[in-house]
Amino acid sequence: MSRHSRLQRQVLSLYRDLLRAGRGKPGAEARVRAEFRQHAGLPRSDVLRIEYLYRRGRRQLQLLRSGHATAMGAFVRPRAPTGEPGGVGCQPDDGDSPRNPHDSTGAPETRPDGR
């Protein structure tokens, strides 16, 4: 087996440090493992993305070590049951209107009556 590159060693070290820092915090170890597993398939050539994720992980490590973090979780959008276009309380998306009140230019949406 070939030796790990410097970046690979840094990522592995970050993984171990995050697991250590997350001990005793509900959801932390599972979240760390899931996050690393999600990005494990990144190609080695995608160095910019790997470095970005590494920096993001270092910031998360600092937060975990700071003592202010008592647990670790993530905001997730609930999946809609099969056959329904959106989740609970979501309006159906007809594809014609933007998802927010501003269109792609950032200008407010105008109503048909001109207001």
Swiss-Prot record:
The keyword Plastid does not apply. GO terms for cellular component: mitochondrial matrix; mitochondrion; nucleoplasm. CDD domains: Complex1_LYR_SDHAF1_LYRM8 (cd20268). Ubiquitously expressed. One of its GO terms (biological process) is mitochondrial respiratory chain complex II assembly. It comes from the Eukaryota. Residues 74-115 are annotated as: Disordered. Disulfide bonds: none annotated. InterPro entries: Complex1_LYR_dom, Complex1_LYR_SDHAF1_LYRM8, SDHAF1. A motif (LYR motif 2) lies at residues 53-55. Keywords: Chaperone, Disease variant, Mitochondrion, Primary mitochondrial disease, Repeat. Changing residue 57 to R: In MC2DN2; abolishes binding to the iron-sulfur transfer complex formed by HSC20, HSPA9 and ICSU; prevents interaction with SDHB; leads to rapid degradation of SDHAF1. The keyword Mitochondrion applies. Pfam families: Complex1_LYR. It is found in: Mitochondrion matrix. A motif (LYR motif 1) lies at residues 14-16. Its main location: mitochondrion. Residues 53-65 are annotated as: Interaction with SDHB. It is linked to Mitochondrial complex II deficiency, nuclear type 2: A form of mitochondrial complex II deficiency, a disorder with heterogeneous clinical manifestations. Some patients have multisystem involvement of the brain, heart, muscle, liver, and kidneys resulting in death in infancy, whereas others have only isolated cardiac or muscle involvement with onset in adulthood and normal cognition. Interacts with SDHB within an SDHA-SDHB subcomplex. Also interacts with the iron-sulfur transfer complex formed by HSC20, HSPA9 and ISCU through direct binding to HSC20. Binding of SDHAF1 to SDHB precedes and is necessary for recruitment of the iron-sulfur transfer complex by SDHAF1. Belongs to the complex I LYR family. SDHAF1 subfamily. Riboflavin supplementation, which is used as a treatment in SDHAF1-deficient patients, enhances SDHA flavinylation and activity and reduces levels of HIF1A, HIF2A and succinate. Plays an essential role in the assembly of succinate dehydrogenase (SDH), an enzyme complex (also referred to as respiratory complex II) that is a component of both the tricarboxylic acid (TCA) cycle and the mitochondrial electron transport chain, and which couples the oxidation of succinate to fumarate with the reduction of ubiquinone (coenzyme Q) to ubiquinol. Promotes maturation of the iron-sulfur protein subunit SDHB of the SDH catalytic dimer, protecting it from the deleterious effects of oxidants. May act together with SDHAF3. This is Succinate dehydrogenase assembly factor 1, mitochondrial.
